[in-house]
Amino acid sequence: CIRDRTNLQLQKDRENLLLSAGVDKNYLKPHYTCEICKDKGYTDGKICSCRTELLKKFASEELSYKTPLKLSSFEDFSLSYYPTEKYGNGISPRERMKGVYEFCREYAADFSTESPNLFMYGETGLGKTHLSLAIANEVIKKGFSVVYDSAQNLFTRLEKERFGREGGNTEDTVLYCDLLILDDLGAEFDTKYVLSEIYNIINSRISYGRPTVISSNAALDELTGLYGARVTSRIIGDYELILFEGRDVRQIKKRLSK
C-alpha cells in the first residue's frame, strides 16, 4: 500500500542521510546484548539463558566475595621452598610440585565445564590453597562463574540457611556454578548433616557435569574414616588425585622473615 511504500522510502532516505554523514546506517537501531530476548530477560514466557547466566555470575561473585582469602596467581608461586632431596619414590618434592604446578596451570588455562574434578591432598602448608586460588583467579578471568570458599564457612552457611537462621540460596549457587572450589575439607565435619551435604554436593555436581576442586589435609587412606564410604568412593572414582609433598611453606616463610 501507499503507506508502506512511504515508510520504506523514509527509512531508505534516513539510511542515506546517515551514510552521507559517515555514520553506520544501523546507528539508530537498538543494539542488544542478547539477541534472543532483546535484553528483556524473558523469551516465550520463560527466563532467558542470558538472565540465568547473569544471576549465576552475581551469586557466585557475592558468595566468593565473602571468603577472607585474596585470589592468588601462578606467577607468585615459588618452587624454591620445596626440597630437592629425593624421597623413597625416587622423586624430590620440588620435582613433584613442579609437575603439580604445571598441571594446575594447564587446568586453569584450558578450563571448560567438561574439565575433570580435582582432589588436592597432602599435609598443611604445601600450597594447596595457593594453587586452588590461582585456578579460581584464571577461571574467573575466562568468564566462568566460580564459587570459592573454605569447607567450614560453606557448611556453616548452608546449615544456617537450611534451618532458617539465615536467608539465601547458597545451595543452588554451589550446585550450579561452573566451578566450585572447596578448600580445606577437614576432619572437623563429622555431623550427619555435614556428611550428608558433602555427599549431596559432590554427587550432584558429578551428575550435572560441573567440575569441582577440593583440597584436604587428609591422606587417601583416611578418607573413609572421615567422610564415609559413599563420599570416598566418589572422590577416588571421579576425581583426579593430586598429591602435594614437601615441608610446610608457611613455616619456612615465617622463619625467613625473622
Locate predicted features:
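Walker A/P-loop nucleotide-binding motif
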Residues: 114-131
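Pre-Walker A (pre-P-loop) alpha-helix and adjacent loop at the N terminus of AAA/AAA+ ATPase modules
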Residues: 70-118
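Short glycine-rich substrate-engagement loop in P-loop NTPases that contacts/grips substrate
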Residues: 84-98, 139-176, 192
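Short, small-residue-biased leader/transition segments that mark boundaries at the very start
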Residues: 1-2
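Interdomain "pre-motor" coupling segment immediately N-terminal to P-loop NTPase/helicase cores
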Residues: 22-72
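Loop/turn-to-beta-strand initiation segments
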Residues: 116, 144-145, 176-179, 208-214
